């Protein structure tokens, strides 16, 4: 059938073999981390120069079969012009370790791509056609391989961390027509990128379909099945327990089985894998061609511009130009991959937050459904309480209006009371004046009574005197009659004298009678005047007593009404009858007029 190993590069098969063991160890997380392996595309390249002093593989021969002895060197044994290849912590993803906080610095690169001396456009590494025999970045020469890797800057030698676990191996060139040229499994080698998955990275980033990813997964599963026989022939101890193998220790592989059926079956499976890989590569080239045209047009335009503007740039070596472009593109790819990882981490955190928020939302909805009837009841109670509060507010406003009206009425009543008190004081002054006038009249009346009594006494005396005079007159008349009878007998002189005395006595009697009559008339006038004054005094006394009774009645009514108003104000101030309207009896209880006792004059 020919040498199958001649169709596949040693590093590719070795990486497949390592990936087969790695796939068995993390079969459950393979699909989850498939895209992470695709991020590692175009990061690394294998050095195919096995003749240098850095080769760590030794070859031995036993029973016409070649086996590979692989060992691991320490960190310091690596060349300084190569970056360390390590198995990443993110699901087995390998790549150059950059500090995520401080991304690597881009080399100064102009906006116009430099052209090589043979007028060919420098194509970006991410879009170069990938040969079907290699799963990593393909190079035409060891020099381009050296330019593919990131050289360590001389001023910052410790910026990138060197990680152990470089997988190195060598294949013998003899025995091309046998399966002994296949590399065996090395337990000390680190996990490499799967060559069947590497084309998925650029296509997924630059518009590739998901068919290539699924096809790569199917091919990788077939690779696992084909390499299980090799792992079982070795006893399966190394693949089943990779953690028990010590780092840095060398491992000697036992020769392969001589079963021809197994060899033919493996060769057929390898051929099938190779054809599937070629199909996948062709589909990837077709997908890459469309996206690479835009990047191919740019160097053409820049070539024309550089021919016009920078004629000296043609003298620069093509290796420097390719190195600069590759470094810039690789740094850009690394930055994009770091951004992608950050975005994935952010997406995972956001998904976790979304789950937490959904759980909280469900709990809140359950609480809402639980609290809905209680909330309706509380809302109904709040509505009732608000209605009661509005009603109480209205009643409070009405009571405040009533209180204000009562207060204004109380103020007006106080003003009226003040006026009535002033009037009462004026009336009291008048009554005092009238009482003083009445006293003076009483004194005058007493004087008049005394005078009347004196006049009565004088009239009695005059009556007695008149009676005496009448008796004397009668006696004189009797004597005169006796003298008349005795006149003719006696001398005439005695009769004349007696006759002359009679008219004088008569005149005296008339005068006394006239005086008595005058005295009687004066007495009658005085008694009538006294009676008239007594009647006037009685009438005035009755008027004064009645007026005083009215004043006392109004004063008592006003006093009682003021007492009731003061009690009502005190109750309002204490708030005893805040919500109940009350009526104040402003008229008050009328005191009977007969119960009022006036001041005795």
UniProtKB/Swiss-Prot annotation:
Lipid attachment in record (N-myristoyl glycine): 2
Pfam families: Fez1 (PF06818)
Modification after translation: Phosphorylated on serine residues. Hyperphosphorylated by the cAMP-dependent kinase PKA during cell-cycle progression.
Superkingdom as given in the UniProt entry: Eukaryota
Polar residues bias: start-end ranges: 174-190
Chief place of localization: cytoplasm
Tissues showing expression: Highly expressed in brain, in particular in cortex, the CA2 region of the hippocampus, olfactory bulb, striatum and pons. Not detectable in the other tissues tested.
GO biological process: negative regulation of macroautophagy; regulation of dendrite morphogenesis; regulation of postsynapse assembly; regulation of synaptic plasticity
S-S pairs: none
Coiled-coil parts of chain: 255-573
Keyword Cytoplasm recorded: yes
Sequence ranges of Basic and acidic residues compositional bias: 153-162
CC annotations in GO: apical plasma membrane; cell body; cytoplasm; dendritic shaft; dendritic spine; glutamatergic synapse; postsynaptic density membrane; postsynaptic membrane
Alphabetic keyword roster: Cell cycle, Cell membrane, Cell projection, Coiled coil, Cytoplasm, Lipoprotein, Membrane, Myristate, Synapse, Tumor suppressor
Region of interest called Disordered, as start-end residue ranges on this chain: 135-190
Keyword Transcription among record annotations: no
Compartments (UniProt record): Cytoplasm; Cell membrane; Cell projection, Dendritic spine; Postsynaptic density
Family: Belongs to the LZTS family.
Self-association state and partner proteins as the record states: Binds EEF1G, TLK2 and CDK1.
Function according to Swiss-Prot or TrEMBL: Involved in the regulation of cell growth. May stabilize the active CDC2-cyclin B1 complex and thereby contribute to the regulation of the cell cycle and the prevention of uncontrolled cell proliferation. May act as tumor suppressor.
Record's protein name: Leucine zipper putative tumor suppressor 1
Species of provenance: Rattus norvegicus (Rat)
């Amino acid at each position: 059938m020919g040498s199958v190993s001649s169709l596949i590069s040693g590093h590719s098969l070795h990486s497949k073999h390592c990936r087969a063991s790695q796939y068995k160890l993390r079969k459950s997380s393979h699909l989850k981390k498939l895209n992470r392996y695709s991020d590692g595309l175009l990061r690394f390249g294998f050095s195919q120069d096995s003749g240098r002093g850095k080769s760590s593989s030794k070859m031995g021969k036993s029973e016409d079969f070649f086996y590979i002895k692989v060992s691991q060197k320490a960190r310091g044994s690596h060349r300084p012009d190569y970056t360390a290849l390590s198995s990443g912590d993110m699901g087995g993803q390998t790549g150059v370790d950059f500090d995520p906080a401080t991304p690597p610095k881009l080399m100064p690169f102009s906006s116009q791509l430099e052209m090589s001396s043979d007028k060919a456009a420098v194509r970006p590494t991410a879009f170069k056609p990938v040969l079907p025999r290699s799963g990593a970045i393909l190079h035409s020469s060891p020099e381009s391989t050296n330019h593919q890797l990131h050289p360590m800057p001389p001023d910052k030698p410790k910026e990138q961390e060197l990680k152990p676990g470089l997988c190195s191996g060598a294949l013998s060139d003899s025995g091309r027509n046998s399966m002994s040229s296949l590399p065996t499994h090395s337990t000390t080698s680190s996990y490499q990128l799967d060559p069947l998955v590497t084309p998925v990275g650029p296509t997924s980033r630059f518009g590739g379909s998901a068919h290539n990813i699924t096809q790569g997964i199917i091919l990788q599963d077939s690779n696992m099945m084909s390499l299980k026989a090799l792992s079982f022939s070795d006893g399966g101890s190394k693949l089943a327990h990779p953690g028990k193998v010590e780092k840095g220790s060398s491992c000697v592989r036992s020769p392969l089985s001589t079963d021809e059926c197994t060899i033919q079956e493996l060769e057929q499976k390898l051929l099938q894998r190779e054809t599937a890989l070629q199909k996948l590569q062709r589909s990837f080239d077709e997908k890459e061609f469309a996206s690479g045209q835009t990047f191919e047009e740019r160097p053409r335009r820049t070539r024309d511009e550089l021919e016009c503007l920078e004629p000296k740039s043609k003298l620069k070596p093509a290796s420097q130009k390719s190195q600069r472009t590759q470094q810039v593109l690789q740094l850009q790819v690394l930055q994009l991959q770091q951004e992608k990882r950050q975005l994935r981490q952010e997406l995972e955190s956001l998904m976790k937050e979304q789950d937490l928020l959904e759980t909280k939302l469900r709990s809140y909805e359950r609480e809402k459904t639980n609290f809905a009837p209680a909330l309706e009841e509380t809302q109904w109670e709040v509505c009732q309480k608000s209605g009661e509060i509005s009603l109480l507010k209205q009643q409070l406003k009405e009571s405040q209006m009533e209180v204000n009206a009562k207060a204004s009425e109380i103020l007006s009543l106080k003003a009226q009371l003040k006026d009535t008190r002033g009037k009462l004081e004026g009336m009291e002054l008048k009554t005092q004046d009238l009482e003083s006038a009445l006293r003076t009249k009483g004194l005058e009346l007493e004087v008049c009574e005394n005078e009347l009594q004196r006049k009565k006494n004088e009239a009695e005396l005059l009556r007695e005197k008149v009676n005496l005079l009448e008796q004397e007159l009668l006696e004189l008349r009797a004597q005169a009659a006796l003298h008349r009878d005795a006149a003719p007998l006696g001398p005439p002189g005695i009769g004349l004298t007696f006759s002359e005395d009679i008219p004088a006595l008569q005149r005296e009697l008339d005068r006394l009678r006239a005086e008595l009559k005058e005295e009687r008339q004066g007495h009658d006038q005085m008694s009538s005047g006294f009676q008239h004054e007594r009647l006037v005094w009685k009438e005035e006394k009755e008027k004064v007593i009645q007026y005083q009774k009215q004043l006392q009645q109004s004063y008592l009514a006003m006093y009682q009404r003021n007492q009731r108003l003061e009690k009502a104000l005190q109750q309002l101030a204490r708030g005893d009858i805040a919500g109940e309207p009350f009526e104040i009896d402003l008229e008050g209880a009328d005191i009977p007029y007969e119960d009022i006792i006036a001041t005795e004059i």
